[in-house]
UniProtKB/Swiss-Prot annotation:
Positions with a binding annotation for ATP: 38-45
GO cellular component terms, semicolon-separated: Gram-negative-bacterium-type cell wall; plasma membrane
The UniProt record lists the keyword Chaperone: no
Listed PROSITE patterns: ABC_TRANSPORTER_1, ABC_TRANSPORTER_2, METN
Disulphide linkage map: none
SMART domains documented for this protein: AAA, NIL
Record localization: Cell inner membrane
Organism: Photorhabdus laumondii subsp. laumondii (strain DSM 15139 / CIP 105565 / TT01)
Gene name tied to this protein: metN
Subunit structure: The complex is composed of two ATP-binding proteins (MetN), two transmembrane proteins (MetI) and a solute-binding protein (MetQ).
Residues annotated as domain ABC transporter: 2-241
Protein name: Methionine import ATP-binding protein MetN
Family under the similarity heading: Belongs to the ABC transporter superfamily. Methionine importer (TC 3.A.1.24) family.
Catalytic activity entry: L-methionine(out) + ATP + H2O = L-methionine(in) + ADP + phosphate + H(+); D-methionine(out) + ATP + H2O = D-methionine(in) + ADP + phosphate + H(+)
Length: 343
């Protein structure tokens, strides 16, 4: 549905050339939700704007719905863009128009008959859950409601693809969840292909089928979400995943923790579980097998792409090599073990 081949984008700043995107290739299958994640300045927005040619790549091919947009004439590109919807972090609604008027605008520009416009807008209002806001103005809407209007407007011409440029960044967590659920519902109901960019791994975790990680204008990792969460291949991907699961060491432990082992101290471990290691009773197995005691201080488990992953802070007590054997046992069963200190 969306195929990018060797996309490069160079911006000229005086005599200086800035490589915003370097040799990026990716494929978004039809009907999937594909996330692109990266830090600020990584090139995410430039990439998504290349998909509908708001930014023209310096080189490379952009195929959407089987068409190479980079070789289309201006008139053909305008027609192709009607099948590509887009929403932004800022809603860009017309304050002088009602909700109905904002959604109807793309249809009016296409000279669609009024009766058809009314029918289509009513369908979209029901789809996004705003049937009671037909005559409301943007000033009287919440942030989440404004984004729902923007989504409805983006769907007015029945696009095959929806591009989401940091669409939830300006929203509070509860509203973000509701907008993500709406996008997932639209994807399921309409078979819509969605490409979204974000700097939040929680967004990817909640709705994406596949994810690509971008850094410094380069695509450094891409795979199905469950694989990236289970086996991240780059430090940047690992950092994004850890941002979704973060456990703080209790203050009293921070104050008494030592950096080196001693006869009267026990190791404080951070254990990271992914995939099968989450479901296996590894802790109870280790306690029985190596005759150790484990004091679990805190833990958290979450899901992404149908795969569970989790993190745990635990204090480990044992004798006669039990601690070392336990750590090796856990590592052999694909648990990442980090000794944070000794308490």
């Amino acid at each position: 549905m969306i195929k990018l081949f060797h996309i490069n984008k160079i911006f000229q700043q005086g005599a200086r050339s800035i490589n915003a995107l370097s040799d990026i290739s990716l494929h978004v299958p039809q009907g999937q939700i594909y996330g692109v994640i990266g830090s600020s300045g990584a090139g995410k927005s430039t990439l998504i704007r290349c998909v509908n040619m708001l930014e023209r790549p310096t080189s490379g091919q952009v195929l959407v719905n089987g068409q190479d947009l980079t070789i289309l004439s201006d008139s053909d590109l305008t027609r192709a863009r009607r099948r590509i919807g887009m929403i932004f972090q800022h809603f860009n609604l017309l304050s002088s128009r009602t909700v109905f008027g904002n959604i109807a605008l793309p249809l009016e520009l296409d000279n669609i008959p009024k009766a058809e416009i009314k029918k289509r807008v009513d369908e979209l209002l029901e789809l996004v859950g705003l049937t009671d806001k037909h005559d409301a103005y943007p000033a009287n809407l919440s942030g989440g409601q404004k984004q729902r209007v923007a989504i409805a407007r983006a769907l007015a011409n029945s696009p095959k693809v929806l591009l989401c440029d940091e669409a939830t960044s300006a929203l509070d967590p509860a509203t973000t969840r509701s907008i993500l659920e709406l996008l997932k519902d639209i994807n399921r109901r309409l078979g819509l292909t969605i490409l979204l960019i974000t700097h939040e791994m929680d967004v990817v975790k909640r709705i994406c089928d596949q994810v690509a990680v971008i850094s410094g204008g380069q695509l450094i990792e891409q795979d199905i979400v469950s694989e990236v969460f289970s086996h991240p291949k780059t430090p940047i991907a690992q950092a994004f995943i850890q941002s979704t699961l973060h456990l703080d060491i209790p203050e009293d432990y921070v104050q008494k923790m030592q950096s080196h082992p001693a006869p009267n101290l026990s190791p404080l471990l951070k254990l990271e579980f992914t995939g099968q290691s989450v479901d296996a009773p590894l802790i109870s197995m280790a306690v029985r097998r190596f005759n150790i005691d484990m004091n679990i201080l805190s833990s958290q488990i979450d899901y992404a792409g149908g795969v569970k992953f989790g993190v745990m802070l635990a204090e480990l007590h044992g004798e006669n090599g039990g601690v070392e054997s336990t750590i090796k046992f856990l590592q052999d069963h694909h648990v990442k073990v980090e000794v944070l200190g000794y308490v």
